[in-house]
Amino acid sequence: MPKCSRPPADGGYAYPAINVTSSQTLNAALKGFADAESDGIIQISVGGAAYVSGIGVNDRVTGSLALAAFAHEVAAKYPNITIALHTDHCAKQYLDEWVRPLLAHEADQVARGQEPTFQSHMWDGSTVPLKENLDIAEELLDKVAEGAHRARNRNRRGRR
């Protein structure tokens, strides 16, 4: 996971989180971070992910991974900033076609010794009953924790 270069509390500010929907909006966000000398969070929304996958394609996983790959490549040209990638506000109807497949993809990355593509995913359970919201949150958290546990164990083995 990227380590931000300076804690926001040191400067009395918070990390900005910018939703991007294309290479153009991503470039604008990165330039803004660089100009402000601020690390930041790049957020990909459900609509942005569908759009980036191709006109009429609407494959949110493809769009998310494509925009994330572009973000990693271009952000590397701004050595004074660190970005984190985040999927933003995933409602229940998009879990099976967006966040769950991304979590599976990232579990495969971690199993191969790679860092996950995204640093966070936001489950938005605001439209479902509280019990269902908490059950889904627990399931998603378990998947993320399992991947983090594998990564931690891999790192420990690598240090011996």
Name each model-derived stretch:
Residues 1-16:
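N-terminal amphipathic alpha-helix/helix-capping segment at the start of soluble metabolic enzymes
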Residues 20-54:
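N-terminal low-complexity or amphipathic/hydrophobic leaders
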Residues 126-160:
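Conserved anion-binding
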Residues 5-9, 72, 148-155:
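Acidic, proline/serine/threonine- and glycine-rich low-complexity intrinsically disordered segments
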Residues 35-36, 76-80, 145-148:
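Short helix-capping segments at alpha-helix termini
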Residues 46-137:
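Active-site beta->alpha loop and helix N-cap motifs at the rims of alpha/beta catalytic domains
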Residues 15-18, 43, 118-121:
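Divalent metal-dependent hydrolysis catalytic cores, especially in the metallo-beta-lactamase
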Residues 19, 29, 88, 151:
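Conserved, mostly hydrophobic/aromatic
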